[in-house]
Amino acid sequence: MALAGIGVDMLEIARMQQAIERRPHFIRRMFTDAERAYCERTARPAEHYAARFAAREAVLKALGTGFSSGIGFQDVSVERDQLGRPQARLAGKAAQIAAEQGVQEIALSISYTRDVAVANAVAVTNAVKPKVDQKEDAAQELARSFKEARSVLDEL
């Protein structure tokens, strides 16, 4: 397997709480029915909404795009597998872009503290492994990304 892209995003939970309170239609527009049902069953829904929003952003960064290129807000959603692990679900334009890039899997990790939600996504393909010099560049990029994420966590 080869790495197609990596994305990291974080969001202050208080900002999500404010968005929910000020614009209730925001969650209906942004999140799928399944995501809303899950988040609303929890003790602190804003944490889970923030984590899912950060996950969307991380997935889109891993694909090399944002909510541009005709990608709809619900084209990326987060579900849980039978073990409770987060799984990225792609639809519409996001699924099309992933298919064009040969993405076979998106590994997703979500975490949050009292104040911040953070998500990390790695898009993986079945492509032939890159040449040695390209592999070093990808490894350096991955190391730099993890260092940046670690420095953010250290500041918390």
Label each region the model flagged.
Residues 1-6, 10-156:
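Core catalytic alpha/beta fold that binds nucleotide/phospho-ligands
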